[in-house]
């Protein structure tokens, strides 16, 4: 009774399609994909900035010696 079979998953998927419709699910999938893509891009941009700072590429005003 507690097992999840392929038949149960197909029934749930059919109910979801009937409830929301294919257009709504397609839109939801596109929005989710865009959100994941944006998140990955932000993470890559942050990593690139951290690597740039770690390599010593600092602005000139931070490298000058003040007495």
Swiss-Prot record:
Record carries keyword tRNA processing: no
Entry membrane topology: Single-pass membrane protein
UniProt key word Cell inner membrane: yes
GO cellular component: TAT protein transport complex
Pfam families: TatA_B_E
Stretches the record annotates as Disordered: 45-67
Function: Part of the twin-arginine translocation (Tat) system that transports large folded proteins containing a characteristic twin-arginine motif in their signal peptide across membranes. TatE shares overlapping functions with TatA.
Protein family membership: Belongs to the TatA/E family. TatE subfamily.
HAMAP family reported for this sequence: TatA_E, TatE
Protein name: Probable Sec-independent protein translocase protein TatE
Organism: Escherichia fergusonii (strain ATCC 35469 / DSM 13698 / CCUG 18766 / IAM 14443 / JCM 21226 / LMG 7866 / NBRC 102419 / NCTC 12128 / CDC 0568-73)
